[in-house]
Structures are given as C-alpha cells and as structure tokens.
C-alpha cells in the first residue's frame, strides 16, 4: 500500500503507471487509487456491535483481526443499496478500516488523457474528490478514501 515506492497519483498517471479500482455506491460509479486498497472482501458478514455510531456498520473478522467497517455513502450524499456490501480494506495511519461499497469492479490502468484534476462544484463532497477519471465511457469521481475516513476516525490499532 504506502511503502517506499508510493508516489503521488498525479505523478504516476503522468507516466501511465496509475491504477484505480472502480466501485459503486448508491448507484453511482466511483474510483479510488488502487494503492490505497489492501484488498477487496466480498460475501462476508459484518457484525453489528452495541452502541456503535451510525457511520460504523460493524466489524469484519479478517484473518483473526476485527476490522471496523465504515459507511462513507452519506459523505457523498448517497445511500448504500446492497444488503451485503463489498468491503474495500484500507489503512489510515496505523488503523485498518473497511469501506463499504455496493459493488467493487475492475482495476483499470489510466493514461494521462483519462485523468483530470477535480473540478469544484461547490458541493460538500468536493473535499473528498481528488480528480475525475474516464471509466466505461463516463466521467467518474476519483475519491480520497483517506480523507473520507479522517472525517470521522474509527478503528482499532493494527
């Protein structure tokens, strides 16, 4: 994920090295830098715990570790539609966190022509959009998962 070889997304896309993972939230297609995602987990039960904040869907048992699973859809003014969401597992600081999405799609390598810096629309969600990429013939928001998770930190130490 963010080892010694981590370079900013803009640098990598300028050299045809940037990859994104596409996913759906609330019927909308989005993407994020694949280097931010350790793995995608599907068909696993998220266990609800008492007294959890609304944004925390529960915890996922992953190789003996309890990983908190967060619903970021409200930050995008969307709503998760899947009964059993796919989970993008990421690390923020030293905390492993799952991000619930309706479905995870393919990993795509981008050319420089397929990436544009984020336009400002004036919406609150602008703070989470780092760019726009062309996927499946459409312009798609490139999201900063780290910034979304910093909005309301959750999780336990790794």
Placement of each model-derived feature along the sequence:
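An acidic, low-aromatic, low-complexity terminal/linker signal
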Residues: 1-158
């Amino acid at each position: 994920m963010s080892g010694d070889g981590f370079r900013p997304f803009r640098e990598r896309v300028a050299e045809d090295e940037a990859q994104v993972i596409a996913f759906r939230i609330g019927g909308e297609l989005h993407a994020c830098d694949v280097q931010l995602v350790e793995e995608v987990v599907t068909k696993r039960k998220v266990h609800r715990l008492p007294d959890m904040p609304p944004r925390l869907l529960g915890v996922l048992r992953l190789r003996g570790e309890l990983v908190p699973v967060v619903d970021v859809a409200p930050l995008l003014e969307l709503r998760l539609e899947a009964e059993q969401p796919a989970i993008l597992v990421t690390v923020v600081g030293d905390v492993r966190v799952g991000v619930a999405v309706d479905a995870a799609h393919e990993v795509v390598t981008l050319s420089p022509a397929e990436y544009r810096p984020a336009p400002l629309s004036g919406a609150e969600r602008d703070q989470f959009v780092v760019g726009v990429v062309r996927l499946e013939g459409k312009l798609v928001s490139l999201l900063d998962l780290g910034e979304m998770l910093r909005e309301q930190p959750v999780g336990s130490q790794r």
